[in-house]
Design a protein with these regions (language model features):
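N-terminal secretory signal peptides that target proteins for export/translocation
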Residues: 1-3
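Intrinsic disorder/low-complexity segments enriched in polar/small residues
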Residues: 5-6, 24
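Sec-dependent N-terminal signal peptides
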Residues: 6-16
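Positively charged, low-complexity terminal tracts
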Residues: 20-185
Length: 185
């Protein structure tokens, strides 16, 4: 009798713990910069260079130097914030240097072609980085809305942009690309 109750209790615990751990499943980052930063047994120097803010999005170039080997990598760091009545959270996503060209092309397409169209159905486009940062736009209720999610697994990391913000974001990405190339020589 006790064994039956024990087994039921144990089975319930195992099932509940699986449900609890499945609630917030964050995707692992595949970013080369994030991977480089996580290196153990190395002394890392991180330098943050401010770029213009776009609406509520904070942009910085991050240059990471392995002091022991002299190797450097850089990325565009993008931060959004979420406020509820009691507290705030910040979410940071990255675009590796190698991703900036494709992202600029994607945003240019959204700005120059997509936002000028009027689809008959709900339409969405999205560019996703190795660090799970998402940029895109969707057409709903007869208008386009651009967005950025610094962490694709949570809507709390979202910032919605006006079409004019897209051009500014493209400029910021081009500045970041030039700065990273210059600082990682």
């Amino acid at each position: 009798m006790y064994m039956k109750h024990f087994l039921i209790l144990l089975l319930s615990f195992v099932l509940m713990s699986n449900v609890a751990f499945a609630q917030d499943s964050k995707e692992e980052s595949k970013s080369k910069t994030v991977e480089f930063m996580a290196g153990c047994g190395s002394l890392m120097k991180k330098e943050f260079y401010d770029l213009p803010k776009v609406k509520g999005v904070v942009n910085q170039v991050l240059i990471i130097t392995n002091v022991l080997t002299g190797k450097k990598v850089g990325c565009l760091s993008v931060e959004t914030s979420y406020y509820n009545g009691r507290s705030s959270d910040s979410y940071i996503g990255t675009l590796d240097y190698e991703e900036l060209d494709a992202c600029v092309k994607s945003l240019t397409y959204i700005k120059d072609e997509l936002l000028l169209s009027t689809p008959d159905v709900y339409t969405e486009v999205e560019y996703k980085t190795l660090d799970n940062l998402k940029l895109g736009a969707f057409y709903s209720k007869s208008r386009w809305t651009a967005f950025i999610y610094t962490k694709g697994y949570t809507s709390r990391s979202a910032e919605f942009l006006d079409s004019s913000n897209i051009a500014t974001f493209i400029e910021v990405m081009n500045q970041a690309k030039s700065m990273i190339a210059d600082k990682t020589k």
